[in-house]
Amino acid sequence: MLLQMAMDGAADGLTIAEFKEFISNIYDSVDIVEFGTSCVYRFGMEGVQEIKQAFPDKLILADMKIMDGGGHMSRMAYSFGADIVTVLAVSDDATIGNVIGSAHKVNKEVMVDMICVSDIAKRIPEVEKL
């Protein structure tokens, strides 16, 4: 089992330095550091890079909620140190497939976010085929 910690406090005005201090305090207990959507918007890919450089042995999840431009967006996140990116399951199959393809090329991972999916039981096997 892996334990994930979400960094979504950017909306509350927290800084990258404050996030790093918090992660340091729970370092031994967490496996995945989620750089939440609000952090992605506020700090950009440079924020992902700063967290990865500070904690290189932790998995960094960039919660980008990709809807289009899947290949380009995921390649960018991976190049800045993300180990996992999110893509929305409601996006078209080509977008999801492009994110998965980008991940495979650099031995990284994808999390398909089921937010707003009306029939999750139907969508899961569709996504698994990609």
Residue positions per predicted region:
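Conserved N-terminal beta1-alpha1 strand-loop-helix module at the mouth
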Residues: 1-62, 66-71
